[in-house]
Amino acid sequence: MSNVRVSNGSPSLERMDARQAEHPKPSACRNLFGPVNHEELTRDLEKHCRDMEEASQRKWNFDFQNHNPLEGRYQWQEVDKGSLPEFYYRPPRPPKGACKVPAQESQDVSGSRQAVPSIGSQAYSEDRHLVEQMPDPTDSPAGLAEQCPGMRKRPAADDSSSQNKRANRTEENVSDGSLNAGSVEQTPKKPGLRRHQT
């Protein structure tokens, strides 16, 4: 390293170290519009939410906070749940991470079949006025995670069936006389291309 030359145009290492210590480089995350006034931001957000709520009340003549109809151009009336289309009261789909256990039957290792209740058959709904039964605590997404920590899309295969893919055999391997009792697959070959010499 003693043979390394430092050009006059570049600062020496000692000067660079001193400069970094004196004036630390400002962070890349900069506030372009000045410091944030959190009180003003909160007031603006609350005002915006109130304005949106009032606009919705005027548009639909319904008090969404108190769940009461208001006087206006719409006539709100209570209807029976049975007269509504099913998608209005159908329980929501379980979350993507929830276990999907078939409701009919499952088969254990010995081959005997058992009836298994379907997990997630009850509703996961926060709209309690639409759902008559409250979900079981074990049916919650947290309970499902405990019951099915690592559900796989496919069950793990036995060691004997792990090699169920057939080998891709070529013509040379077939002519060796090492044929299996099963069928032989051959890879199709492209027709030979003429090479032009230049």
Swiss-Prot record:
Belongs to the CDI family. Coiled coil: none annotated. One of its GO terms (cellular component) is nucleus. It comes from Cricetulus griseus (Chinese hamster). This is Cyclin-dependent kinase inhibitor 1B. Residues 1-34, 85-198 are annotated as: Disordered. Residues 14-25 have a biased composition (Basic and acidic residues). It comes from the Eukaryota. Phosphorylated; phosphorylation occurs on serine, threonine and tyrosine residues. Phosphorylation on Ser-10 is the major site of phosphorylation in resting cells, takes place at the G(0)-G(1) phase and leads to protein stability. Phosphorylation on other sites is greatly enhanced by mitogens, growth factors, cMYC and in certain cancer cell lines. The phosphorylated form found in the cytoplasm is inactivate. Phosphorylation on Thr-198 is required for interaction with 14-3-3 proteins. Phosphorylation on Thr-187, by CDK1 and CDK2 leads to protein ubiquitination and proteasomal degradation. Ubiquitinated; in the cytoplasm by the KPC complex (composed of RNF123/KPC1 and UBAC1/KPC2) and, in the nucleus, by SCF(SKP2). The latter requires prior phosphorylation on Thr-187. Ubiquitinated; by a TRIM21-containing SCF(SKP2)-like complex; leads to its degradation. It holds the Pfam family CDI. The keyword Cytoplasm applies. One of its GO terms (biological process) is G1/S transition of mitotic cell cycle. Its main location: nucleus. Keywords: Cell cycle, Cytoplasm, Endosome, Nucleus, Phosphoprotein, Protein kinase inhibitor, Ubl conjugation. Residues 1-11, 104-124, 175-186 have a biased composition (Polar residues). Important regulator of cell cycle progression. Inhibits the kinase activity of CDK2 bound to cyclin A, but has little inhibitory activity on CDK2 bound to SPDYA. Involved in G1 arrest. Potent inhibitor of cyclin E- and cyclin A-CDK2 complexes. Forms a complex with cyclin type D-CDK4 complexes and is involved in the assembly, stability, and modulation of CCND1-CDK4 complex activation. Acts either as an inhibitor or an activator of cyclin type D-CDK4 complexes depending on its phosphorylation state and/or stoichometry. One of its GO terms (molecular function) is cyclin-dependent protein serine/threonine kinase inhibitor activity. InterPro entries: CDI_dom, CDI_dom_sf. A motif (Nuclear localization signal) lies at residues 153-169. The modification Phosphoserine is found at residue 10. Forms a ternary complex composed of CCNE1, CDK2 and CDKN1B. Interacts directly with CCNE1; the interaction is inhibited by CDK2-dependent phosphorylation on Thr-187. Interacts with COPS5, subunit of the COP9 signalosome complex; the interaction leads to CDKN1B degradation. Interacts with NUP50; the interaction leads to nuclear import and degradation of phosphorylated CDKN1B. Interacts with CCND1 and SNX6. The keyword Membrane does not apply. PANTHER family: CYCLIN-DEPENDENT KINASE INHIBITOR 1, CYCLIN-DEPENDENT KINASE INHIBITOR 1B. It is found in: Nucleus; Cytoplasm; Endosome. The modification Phosphotyrosine is found at residues 74, 88-89.
